[in-house]
Amino acid sequence: MKLSPYSRKIILTTFNNWHVDKEFADPMYNYLVFGYSPGSCFTAVLANDFLSAVSRSHPGNTIPAFKALAGWIRDTVPAQARGSYEAVDQWALLGADARRAVLESAGLVLTEDREMWLTLKGEPVVEPVLY
């Protein structure tokens, strides 16, 4: 699914609000928007499998980073895309239009009409910088 900078900003702002590290945010963004696998550790996090998440985690990952990610998932990720391995797998199998409909309903992306309107108006947009 192709997102305008306006919709991209909405999702990136949610990461910024939770202080999610860029190394965590990038795979989660790609999972939500494109249905790409976020990797074994983050798949386990999305599936609520703590033991697998920690055992598959990079040694440099920190508890505060995981806490920020967990808060972001709880507050941001649609229920259809988290909670079990089956839900994570089903999200990845959804077509772009179905994923977009869920993300629009969750307020994470704008409708294509709204994106077009903002683009035509030349509305300025500044994406948050993730660290």
Where does each model-flagged region fall?
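IQ-motif-like calmodulin-binding regions
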Residues: F50
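A signal for specific C-terminal beta-sheet/loop modules enriched in small/flexible residues
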Residues: R56-G60, V125-L130
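N-terminal low-complexity, intrinsically disordered segments
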Residues: M1-V45, S55, N61-V88
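Amphipathic alpha-helical binding modules
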Residues: T62-K121
